[in-house]
């Protein structure tokens, strides 16, 4: 634990000039306010720094816009992308009128989830290990106007560039990963080794416990970096650093990164598989003598995730693009089942050896368009509901789900086919979130209304380029 006094001393000792205060909005994007170093003191870590919250997506109206950012001293790190020595600090949000934590602040909701876990007596720590995939592109252009709508992506690794004619200063040297064949090739096919290495080492300098990096399955520059699991809020903080570092290192190399689940048609999308477990008094609770070495509690946790999965996906897969990834044929977990080692199931129990501390489950549906604080909190609530109500997940599905007969497949529940359907499921099933006191009814309704009005309905209003291909000459 780091104290406010230690942070203030560091500012003086390391001659920090600016303090960059970061907080996350409802949708999942970091926002920031930069202060001169003499503008914070010990009270900033308790009373907070005032700001106008009226322009933050999904937050206050303009007539009640005053809010405060409360600095978390445990999150201070030197920003490697600022020219002037700058200390970044992550904040949670308070209501200045009441002094209460703001019920729409995702980081506050995440803390409530931990408090709820402790209050149940089930455990005292929830660990999460997200694996967020992404694409590195050389160019990304898109526009939507009254008379046009398009996107154009390009990558030096794109299989579509295999026949592209080069120039004298930039010849085509081949070695493009083919569709669905991008997993683990060495250079020169993997042209992003050095970029990923810099991303990984930069994260390490910021205190993220790094593990690995590698190319992913899709053509066009799909990659993944790995970091160690952490406590719920800690892991969410690390994931935000992960995205921040990856985007900014890519920019340094003249590249651009997206965490969209399905930017490329006809190839694998990008997910964010979430490993998770509950501990108490320093001991893991998911290891036992049941299926795949799980405890009964671990199975009940799976039961909660599977029961509430359609509603959960409105939070863990919260974009219209999410459901273009969740389709058969691209290693996507479209069927709601669990299995040991079977990556075609939506929940997998990894083969983790004999160490009980490594026993965990992996929920494979989520993607990185989710807000990690909200996603982790919602998954924990669903799992706890399974434990409290002893929701058994049924028999595991150890077959390859993609090879089941139509009759067998009809018996396996599937993920919602669209964001609208997921939001409808959340509308009908959210007591497991609100009865806990973790999420408020106000937050859930605001989330549903925001997503419907600003994303679902907006997509429905606009002509799609493919519609012209199939309907123009009717």
UniProtKB/Swiss-Prot annotation:
Residues that, per the record, bind ATP: 211, 275-277, 343, 348, 357
Positions contributing to L-glutamate binding: 268-269, 325, 331, 343, 364
GO molecular function list: ATP binding; glutamine synthetase activity; metal ion binding
SUPFAM superfamilies for this protein: Glutamine synthetase, N-terminal domain, Glutamine synthetase/guanido kinase
Domain GS beta-grasp: from-to ranges: 14-99
Transmembrane segments: none
Keywords: ATP-binding, Cytoplasm, Heterocyst, Ligase, Magnesium, Metal-binding, Nitrogen fixation, Nucleotide-binding, Phosphoprotein
One record GO biological process: glutamine biosynthetic process
Binding site for Mg(2+) 2: 133, 216, 224
PROSITE patterns per record: GLNA_1 (PS00180), GLNA_ADENYLATION (PS00182), GLNA_ATP (PS00181), GS_BETA_GRASP (PS51986), GS_CATALYTIC (PS51987)
GS catalytic domain boundaries: 106-474
Keyword hit for Nucleotide-binding: yes
EC number(s) reported in the record: 6.3.1.2
Cofactor info, note text: Binds 2 Mg(2+) ions per subunit.
Subcellular location: Cytoplasm
Modified residues (O-AMP-tyrosine): 402
Any one annotated GO CC term: cytoplasm
Amino-acid positions noted as binding Mg(2+) 1 in the UniProt annotation, renumbered to this chain: 131, 273, 362
Keyword presence, Cell membrane: no
Catalytic reactions of this protein: L-glutamate + NH4(+) + ATP = L-glutamine + ADP + phosphate + H(+)
Protein's job: Involved in nitrogen metabolism via ammonium assimilation. Catalyzes the ATP-dependent biosynthesis of glutamine from glutamate and ammonia.
Subunit structure: Oligomer of 12 subunits arranged in the form of two hexagons.
Family: Belongs to the glutamine synthetase family.
Misc. remarks from the entry: In Anabaena, it is present in ammonia-grown vegetative cells as well as in heterocysts (for nitrogen fixation).
PANTHER family given in the database record: GLUTAMINE SYNTHETASE, LENGSIN
Name this polypeptide is given: Glutamine synthetase
Organism whose genome encodes this protein: Nostoc sp. (strain PCC 7120 / SAG 25.82 / UTEX 2576)
Upper lineage: Bacteria, Bacillati, Cyanobacteriota, Cyanophyceae, Nostocales
């Amino acid at each position: 634990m780091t104290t406010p006094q230690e942070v203030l001393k560091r500012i003086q000792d390391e001659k920090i000039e600016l303090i960059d205060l970061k907080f996350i909005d409802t949708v999942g994007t970091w926002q920031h306010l930069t202060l001169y170093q003499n503008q914070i003191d010990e009270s900033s870590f308790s009373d907070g720094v005032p700001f106008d919250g009226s322009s933050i997506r999904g937050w206050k109206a303009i007539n009640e816009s005053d809010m405060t950012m409360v600095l978390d001293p445990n999150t201070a790190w030197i920003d490697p992308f600022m020219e002037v020595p700058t200390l970044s600090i992550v904040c949670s949000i308070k209501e200045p009128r009441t002094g209460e934590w703001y019920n729409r602040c995702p980081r506050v909701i995440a803390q409530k989830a931990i408090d709820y876990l402790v209050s149940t007596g089930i455990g005292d720590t929830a660990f999460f290990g997200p694996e967020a995939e992404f694409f590195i592109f050389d160019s990304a252009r898109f526009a939507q106007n009254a008379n046009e709508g398009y996107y154009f992506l390009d990558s030096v690794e794109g299989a579509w560039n295999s026949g592209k004619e080069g120039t004298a200063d930039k010849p085509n040297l081949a070695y493009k990963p083919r569709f669905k064949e991008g997993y683990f090739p060495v250079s020169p096919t993997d042209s992003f080794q050095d970029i990923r290495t810099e991303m990984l080492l930069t994260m390490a300098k910021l205190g993220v416990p790094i593990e690995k990096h590698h190319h992913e399955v899709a053509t066009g520059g799909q990659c993944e970096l790995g970091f160690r699991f952490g406590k719920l809020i800690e892991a969410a903080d690390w994931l935000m650093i992960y995205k921040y570092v990856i985007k900014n290192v890519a920019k340094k190399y003249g590249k651009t990164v997206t965490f969209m689940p399905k930017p490329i048609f006809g190839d694998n999308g990008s997910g964010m598989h979430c490993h998770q477990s509950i501990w108490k008094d320093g001991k893991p609770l998911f290891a036992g003598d049941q299926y795949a070495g799980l405890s009964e509690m671990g199975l009940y946790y799976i039961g909660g995730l599977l029961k509430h999965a359609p509603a959960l996906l409105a939070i863990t897969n919260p974009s219209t693009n999410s459901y273009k990834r969740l389709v058969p044929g691209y290693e996507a977990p479209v069927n709601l089942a669990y299995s040991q080692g079977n990556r075609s199931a939506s929940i997998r129990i990894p083969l983790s050896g004999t160490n009980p501390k490594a026993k965990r489950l992996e929920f494979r549906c989520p993607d990185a368009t989710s807000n990690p604080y909200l996603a982790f909190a919602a998954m924990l609530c669903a799992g706890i509901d399974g434990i409290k109500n002893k929701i058994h997940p049924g028999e595991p599905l150890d077959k390859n789900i993609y090879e089941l007969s139509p009759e067998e497949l009809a018996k396996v529940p599937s993920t919602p086919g669209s964001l609208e359907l997921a939001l409808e499921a959340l509308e009908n099933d959210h007591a497991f979130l609100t009865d806990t006191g973790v999420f408020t009814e106000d937050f859930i309704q605001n989330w549903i209304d925001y997503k419907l009005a600003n994303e679902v309905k907006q997509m429905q209003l606009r002509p799609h380029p493919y519609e012209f291909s199939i309907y123009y000459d009717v």
